A protein has these predicted regions:
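Glycine-rich phosphate-binding loops that contact phosphosugars or nucleotide phosphates
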Residues: 58-220, 399, 403
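Acidic catalytic cores of enzymes that act on phosphate-bearing nucleotides/polynucleotides
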Residues: 201-203, 215-345
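A short, well-structured juxtamembrane/interface segment
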Residues: 45-61, 224-235
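C-terminal amphipathic alpha-helical interaction region
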Residues: 386-410
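Extended, charge-enriched "interface" segments that sit outside catalytic cores
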Residues: 1-58, 317-326
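Hydrophobic alpha-helical scaffolding
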Residues: 92-95, 125, 153, 157, ...
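Structural beta-sheet core signal
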Residues: 69, 116-118, 154, 245, ...
């Protein structure tokens, strides 16, 4: 693994909890090679789809200067998290339907050199369909109707839907969305890998990183990740109802958003669930740390940081003797001191803390971490009798929203 983990104030799981964790692991193993919901994990071992993804990404990179991915939630957050590794910044993921945000982006684009990828598993996601229809009209007005089929690409299920009908009308190339891999669990599918590959990332390394974690978690007896699952279950049963993830790495801000959806939507069911809290060091030391240190003792903490970069910017001149204590320090020195002091004060208060320290940050390392969080979520769900897949409650809101929109036009 390309990161190390340390744990503080985590008790050994109770015997019955440990048994349930092992039963959950067995369930994951049994389902891994099938075509069930566990395909989101098993897909890590697939290779046949990679050529199509790489060929398409190469076509896009050779024919367009920029790509806009239109999706929301699980159709966007995985891609956004992976793209945090990209140095090219040639892909924008548009989640918002805030009129100002959408207008500013679309009006800033060189439409003739921009590709648009719409991602909707159902083909009916209101937000990304709305974005798509608006920018289609802009492309038609500026470049002509025939340009729509050249600039737009769809990723959706292979079934009749409004979006597949639109694709047929305009001859839009369409990729098949995996039927059993959806939403928050889809970063290893073409939903995550197409944008990542367009962004110049190594998609084989992304899949291999996931495999590394799967093999470790499922085949290493009494490993620390499974022990953590047991601790989380016991903490939850004893009143811990908030799950804080706080990286001291700016590029991981999208990881925390992805994790927030993963944890909340998977385990918030039947009157149960813990609240995921996304934070970022050091800024949220100045907004949330007071609560962590002196508020309710109801939180489990995961802090993420990295080894110091020898090329980190250094303070070589202080200009005032009052700042002499900073001379010679790098920004990474200061960041790590801020991190270590935060962890230490929480540990001293006997609060449950996990620390993940990356040796290096790249596609493989990130994917190892993402798969760890996915497996932890699935295993904790199975061990507590919660189905970690599906999100039946939110379907009610989607149906209501469509009814309200239809009524608005009457």
């Amino acid at each position: 693994m390309l990161y190390n983990q340390k744990y503080y104030n985590l008790a050994t799981a109770k015997a019955d909890t440990a048994k349930k964790i092992q039963e959950a692991v067995k369930s994951v193993k049994d389902e891994l090679n099938g075509n069930s919901d566990m395909k989101c994990v098993g897909i890590a071992y697939e290779k046949d789809d990679l050529k199509e993804i790489k060929d398409f990404a190469s076509f896009i990179r050779n024919n367009f200067k920029h790509t806009v991915v239109m999706g929301i939630g699980g159709s966007s957050l995985g891609a956004m998290t992976l793209l945090s590794m990209s140095k090219e910044k040639n892909v924008t993921v548009l989640e918002s339907i805030d009129s100002n945000t959408v207008k500013e982006l679309f009006e800033s684009l060189d439409l003739a050199n921009t590709a648009f990828l719409t991602v909707s598993k159902s083909g009916k996601t209101i937000e990304c369909i709305s974005q798509t229809l608006i920018v289609m009209k802009m492309v038609e007005d500026k470049l002509g109707r025939d340009a729509i089929g050249k600039h737009f690409f769809f990723l959706t299920e292979n079934k009749e839907s409004p979006i597949t009908n639109l694709a047929k009308e305009f001859n839009i190339k369409t990729f098949e969305h995996h039927k059993t891999v959806g939403g928050r669990y889809s970063y290893l599918s073409n939903t995550g890998l197409i944008p990542a590959c367009i962004g110049g990332l190594d998609i084989e390394a992304i899949r291999q990183g996931a495999i590394d974690t799967i093999e470790y978690v499922l085949n290493t007896p009494n490993n620390d990740i499974l022990n953590t699952c047991g601790s989380i279950v016991d903490f939850t049963n004893n009143g811990v109802d908030a799950n804080v993830v706080m990286p001291y790495i700016d590029r991981f801000i999208n990881l925390t958003k992805w994790y927030r959806q993963l944890w909340a939507e998977s385990l918030g069911k039947g009157g149960r669930g813990t609240i995921p809290v996304d934070a970022l060091g050091t800024s949220d030391q100045h907004s949330q740390l007071q609560l962590y240190m002196d508020g309710p003792r109801n939180k489990f903490y995961t802090f993420i940081y990295k080894d110091k970069d020898p090329n980190s910017l250094k303070i070589t001149k202080t200009y005032n003797e009052g700042f002499e204590y900073l001379k010679g320090l790098s920004l990474d020195d200061i960041m790590n001191i801020e991190f270590e002091s935060t962890v230490e004060v929480l540990v001293k208060r006997e609060l449950p803390v996990r620390v993940i320290k990356f040796k290096e940050i790249n596609e493989k390392a990130l994917s190892q971490c993402l798969m760890q969080f996915m497996l932890e979520t699935i295993i904790c769900g199975k061990a507590t009798g919660i189905d970690p897949f599906g999100q039946q409650a939110v379907e009610e809101r989607k149906i209501l929203a469509r009814e309200m929109m239809a009524n608005l036009k009457k």
